[in-house]
Swiss-Prot record:
Its EC number is 5.2.1.8. One of its GO terms (biological process) is 'de novo' cotranslational protein folding. It comes from Burkholderia cenocepacia (strain HI2424). Involved in protein export. Acts as a chaperone by maintaining the newly synthesized protein in an open conformation. Functions as a peptidyl-prolyl cis-trans isomerase. It is an enzyme of class 5 (isomerase). The lineage of its organism: Bacteria, Pseudomonadati, Pseudomonadota, Betaproteobacteria, Burkholderiales. It catalyses: [protein]-peptidylproline (omega=180) = [protein]-peptidylproline (omega=0). The keyword Lyase does not apply. This is Trigger factor. Its main location: cytoplasm. Belongs to the FKBP-type PPIase family. Tig subfamily. Keywords: Cell cycle, Cell division, Chaperone, Cytoplasm, Isomerase, Rotamase. Disulfide bonds: none annotated.
């Protein structure tokens, strides 16, 4: 007899699952007999417990397990017979009216939606482009020099000079201070320190504190008021005004390494050739620019696809993805060293909007890939792995690392599929190219 599938909504369905009681009972009896061979009870050797006693002890548990298994199997059979594309897990409830010879359950579930993707020619995408020139290379060299900065005591002669005649603390100097802070003449936790180092101008300290330290010479001190921000991480002092006295103990001026052969060697240029160094920096910047532009345009393409697509999103899939995002958040907390991160009370509701977008986008992409043959080809995956490996010291080892793990390879395959989708959409959409600076590109990709 054909199963009747009821429509309860746009995606929600219900079907009745019927299980003959004699079939269920046979399975229960078989499992109890199997269980009796290993079950232990006081006063009996293993495998010698009377079958009746085993049944009395475990019948309820075994019946529940058998019904669960049989219902799942029957639902799978029915869903295949009725060509149902079930989204998520069904829920089963016993029917109020039961036949004498069968168990009857209502299975309620959702099905995958029909996905309608509009005309790609109407999609609008802005594609960022950037060029790497001497200015970008020089800025990168400046960053690299600052990463290798070392300090010398101001006023003391050394191989790099004495830092100038002015021995007062300036922005960029590393200073070492003692300080004492009080609120209404009472010291507070964290308000006192000795030999405390920081670099002026880095923003590590509150602005009033840095301003007070600027211009001081070794041995000088200054007293000043400092109002803690209302959102300051130290709740006991947030919003309050403290009086600090800071004493300058040491002032060191920054010396940046010269851009010479030794500097080039420190960047991995074995012969110290500056032209090679700049060429390699340019190549790395171009690779980074390509990665960032691809990321930005991918997000634009995904947004454009969502705008022109129509579909209902199964709640079951959204709920599953919410839980997945909760677990990802807990893993992130654990990696940051947060205690008991795996049990952190993170409400799934906070990911509702993000999960709905992810699920909706996944359904749209799946439809687009299937309809247009955009699956990842093995040679495409290998090309992306090779490209990724180029930025490492031993590319061959990185390639082996990828191909030794199916999960890592699957992640790269998903990346290739997304790239295929992006290229396909860009070939049909209204695309506007926009030249942006590398700095603007970096800022945009950080916000994406």
């Amino acid at each position: 007899m054909a199963n009747v599938v009821e429509n309860l909504g746009k995606l929600e369905r219900r079907v009745t699952i019927s299980l003959p009681k004699d079939t269920v009972q046979k399975e229960i009896d078989a499992r109890i007999q199997k269980l009796a061979k290993t079950v232990r009870m006081p006063g009996f050797r293993p495998g010698k417990v009377p079958l009746k006693m085993v049944a009395q002890q475990y019948a309820g548990q075994v019946e529940a397990e058998v019904l669960s298994d049989k219902i799942g199997q029957e639902f799978f059979t029915v869903s295949r017979a009725e060509n149902l594309r079930v989204a998520g897990q069904p829920s089963f409830e016993p029917k109020q009216e039961q036949a004498e010879d069968a168990y009857a359950f209502d299975a309620t579930f959702e099905v995958y939606p029909e996905v309608k993707i509009g005309d790609l020619a109407t999609a609008e995408v802005e594609r960022s482009t950037t060029s790497i020139g001497d200015a970008e290379i020089d800025r990168t060299l400046d960053i690299l020099r600052k990463q290798r900065v070392h300090y010398h005591a101001r006023g003391e002669a050394g191989e790099h000079g004495d830092g100038g005649a002015d021995t007062a603390a300036k922005n960029g100097d590393r200073v070492t201070v003692d300080f004492v802070g009080k609120i209404e003449d009472v010291a507070f936790q964290g308000g006192t320190a000795e030999d405390f180092p920081f670099v002026l101008g880095e923003g590590r300290m509150l602005p009033e504190f840095e301003t007070a330290a600027l211009g001081l010479k070794v041995g000088e001190q200054r007293t000043f008021d400092l109002k803690f921000p209302d959102d300051y991480h130290g709740k006991d002092v947030a919003g309050k005004t403290a009086q600090f006295t800071v004493t300058m103990k040491k002032i060191e001026w920054p010396h940046l390494p010269e851009i010479d052969a030794e500097f080039a060697k420190s960047l991995g240029i074995e012969d110290g050739d500056l032209t090679k160094m700049r060429a390699e920096i340019k190549e790395n910047l171009e690779r980074e620019a390509k990665r960032r532009t691809q990321s930005i345009v991918k997000n634009q393409v995904m947004d454009a696809l969502l705008k022109i697509s129509e579909l209902d999103v199964p709640k079951a899939l959204i709920e599953q993805d919410q839980q997945r995002l909760v677990e990802m958040a807990r893993q992130d907390l654990a990696q940051r060293g947060v205690p008991n991160a795996k049990d952190a009370p993170i409400p799934a509701e906070m990911f509702a909007e993000q999960a709905e977008r992810r699920v909706k986008l996944g359904l749209v992409l799946a439809e687009l890939v299937k309809a247009n043959g955009l699956e990842a080809k093995p040679e495409q995956i290998r090309a992306e792995v090779d490209e990724f490996a180029k930025s490492y010291e031993d590319p061959k080892e990185v390639v082996r690392w990828y191909y030794s793990n199916q999960q890592r390879l699957a992640e790269m395959e998903a990346f290739v599929v997304e790239s295929n989708v992006v290229d396909f959409v860009l070939g049909k959409a209204k695309v506007t190219d926009k030249e942006v600076s590398f700095e603007a590109l970096a800022s945009a990709s950080a916000q994406a």
